[in-house]
Amino acid sequence: MNTFGHRFRFTTFGESHGKALGCIVDGVPAGIKIDEKFIQSEMDRRKPGQNKFATQRKEGDVVEILSGVFEGMTTGTSISMIIFNENQKSGDYSNIKDLFRPGHADFTYFNKYGIRDYRGGGRSSARETAARVAAGAIAKLLLKELNIDIRSGICEINGIQASNFDFENVKDSEIYALDKSVEEEQKNAILEARNSHNSVGGVALVNVKNCPIGLGEPLYFKLDSQIANAMMSINAVKAVEIGDGILASKVKGYENNDQIRKAGFKTNHTGGILGGISNGDEINVKVYFKATPSIFIEQETIDIYNNEVNCNLKGRHDPCVAVRGSVVAESMMALVLADMVLLNLSSKIENIKKVYEK
């Protein structure tokens, strides 16, 4: 499946070493002002080759809008966007075209489909997430009309945890670090892994401010279930925590409950979601990325003929996918919320009457 969402939905296409990749976004209301500079700025946050903490594959990631926008405004029809690949080096993968790279989707894709694009993983490559960020930028422009603000940052690298979450620090940080006091240590962990031909994992925090009460469709389209679904669809994500997450299973009910006052909730252990519906508090989600599987250390594997062989990788890869992955997680949050905003319009007859009553 290449489509995500119900009312506000997007479909992505393209491969890592193909001619282009892109997306089609459906369900976008007419009349939203499209800021192409903003869309490109979102792409620039995710694009590769910007510093020594990311892959050295250099892509401009310039987005071209093909449809759905007229004179700077959405028309209510499908918005299609395309991003042309510019810096593929398919020759880097010729030595592993018959091998299954440990930690990658090569083995499962080949066994499922009987064929695979070995050039950078093809469709299974994280290169696909560029299209998600483009679609997420459209979702953000919709949410901006409602003053819903989404931000993200890195709260952990290789077990080095942030104790302070400062989203202002993220803006000037090469690794989008939330805590300046541990940023250098986190950077060093990435560089040490890179210099030893290895990789490290990390954790991104996604935060939503000004989310209205009522987003989420129980029972089988709950807000938290769709957030988890969205985040787990991102390459290399192995776990998602909403609010206190795992900690909620380790404390007693009185400690975990968010008591309610006239001014709002006393605490926010639940992460802004109750019963699958947003409660008006800030939404907090932690997204856990595994260490990049593409490493330059010899590993054991098998080939497509079931022979046991050794695997030696070449190419250009992120020493820590969590850094750029945090931007993708932020985009997926925007796409989920845009969908939920539109779905919520039909929750009450009063909402429908406002549109159709004369």
Swiss-Prot record:
InterPro entries: Chorismate_synth, Chorismate_synth_AroC_sf, Chorismate_synthase_CS. Pathway: Metabolic intermediate biosynthesis; chorismate biosynthesis; chorismate from D-erythrose 4-phosphate and phosphoenolpyruvate: step 7/7. The keyword NADP applies. GO terms for biological process: amino acid biosynthetic process; aromatic amino acid family biosynthetic process; chorismate biosynthetic process. Reduced FMN (FMNH(2)). FMN binds at residues 123-125, 235-236, 275, 290-294, 316. One of its GO terms (cellular component) is cytosol. Keywords: Amino-acid biosynthesis, Aromatic amino acid biosynthesis, FAD, Flavoprotein, FMN, Lyase, NADP. One of its GO terms (molecular function) is chorismate synthase activity. Coiled coil: none annotated. NADP(+) binds at residue 46. Its EC number is 4.2.3.5. SUPFAM superfamilies: Chorismate synthase, AroC. It catalyses: 5-O-(1-carboxyvinyl)-3-phosphoshikimate = chorismate + phosphate. Its cofactor is FMNH2. Homotetramer. Belongs to the chorismate synthase family. This reaction introduces a second double bond into the aromatic ring system. This is Chorismate synthase.
